[in-house]
Amino acid sequence: MKHFSLNTLLCTIVVASIAIAPCESDDKLITQTCSKTPYPAQCISYIKADDNSKDVRDVPGLGIIMAQVLVLEAQAPKDILFVLLGAGKRPDIQVQLKTCLESYSFIIKTAMPAAIDSFKIGKPRLAEDYANTAALVVSKCEKSFNGKSPITNENNVTHEVARILGAIAKQL
């Protein structure tokens, strides 16, 4: 009876070790990758919030997740800008609103799909360029309002995510 219990215990330990090992390595990959970005804690938080992160085994996979995060984060300011433009209550800022809306549309519809494709085909420099461009156009959007846009918080978050994405791509 003792022999059976010992074998059962050993089998349980081996199976548990195998099941836990990938999780530890995923956490290590995420932590190591995010530690080389300008916002490590936010990077870890964004990536771990994505259910697919547990299946990612390499840095390009983390880059794809961050590009998807950028699309999601860019959607809120785009929606706000669209509503503000439609309301037409502030004719003095219509040009800036339209320019910012076009920038966010570019990020969502062009830059991030291209960045994701760049990671998939092994061209991380292109992904880095798209991320840096996204950060730049968001900064220009905010500056066009002298730092007091109706979407300052959203611009800051989008800029942060774009910088994280650029830093991840640069590691490749």
Language-model segments: residues:
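Terminal membrane/secretory targeting segments in land-plant proteins
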Residues: M1-D27
